[in-house]
Amino acid sequence: RLFAEMTALENVMVGRHIRTKSGLLGAVLRTKSFKEEEAAIAKRAQELLEYVGIGKFADYKARTLSYGDQRRLEIARALATDPQLIALDEPAAGMNATEKVQLRELIDRIRNDNRTILLIEHDVKLVMGLCDRVTVLDYGKQIAEGTPATVQKNEKVIEAYLGTGGH
């Protein structure tokens, strides 16, 4: 969850603080190393806002951003931790078509930067267009796994999600 009353920049900085070395004492005493580290964190946070396409909103409160921009802010904050794996749970939920295109481009960019992405998503078009491997669940039970092309031809998947199934 975003901190609604904090700026976009501050939200990303929160994510980066997991990597700090100064500690509480440095923060309380406002030591030189703490100030240098904070400046570096702010710089990296701004870079991440640019990376996800919302750099111009750095000083905007999170609550004022559009729904799609809030999702990108969440992704920037997650990236601030320098994860090996980034899990995205329903990132396209509630997005309009334009926001979904932007999301797809961002996820593709993250993937091309050699980050592993675990995408949990019901938007079949988005999943099939982005993922190298797909695992399909129906009511919590795995019904298919493989490449998007293989999964799309699976009868159980067609019945549950792509065809005339009950979902």
Residue ranges and their predicted role:
Residues R1-H167:
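Glycine-rich phosphate-binding loops of nucleotide-dependent enzymes
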